Amino acid sequence: MKMTRHAPFEKLSNIFKDYPYIASAYLFGSHVSGKENQESDVDIAILIKGNAPRGRELLHEEDYLAYKVAKVLGAKEVDLIDLNSKGMIFQHNVLRTGNLIYDSDPAFRIKFETSVIIRFCDFEPTLRYLEGHQLQGRIGRYTRP
């Protein structure tokens, strides 16, 4: 996981610091893959510690945070994703392809990343097996006379 050091994203540290429950943030999606265009949104996954607000209060704070991030970056839209609440495959994809843009609690982040990687490695053979059977099913469906 590399730490991104681009001027616009460095400015985000000052915004994220106002939210002590955010352990780290990852930029992912088209802005990392180099496929962004004028219509692209900015995808940011945030890793939240246990001391975060709950329910509506958290949603309100995340919406306001997305607004502030969009304003700083000059982006039309920012998708702010709560990484904790997503599935293991999504989490692994963010860790594998994303760039770390904020890190206030490295110990918490490393523990989270380690857990995701271990769970993914345990599950990967099953995932590959399922993908193989799904592909065989599609091939069989389209090659029948």
Please provide the spans of the model-predicted regions.
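Catalytic core of pol beta-like nucleotidyltransferases
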Residues: 1-24, 32-38, 51-145
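Short glycine-rich His-centered loop
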Residues: 41-43
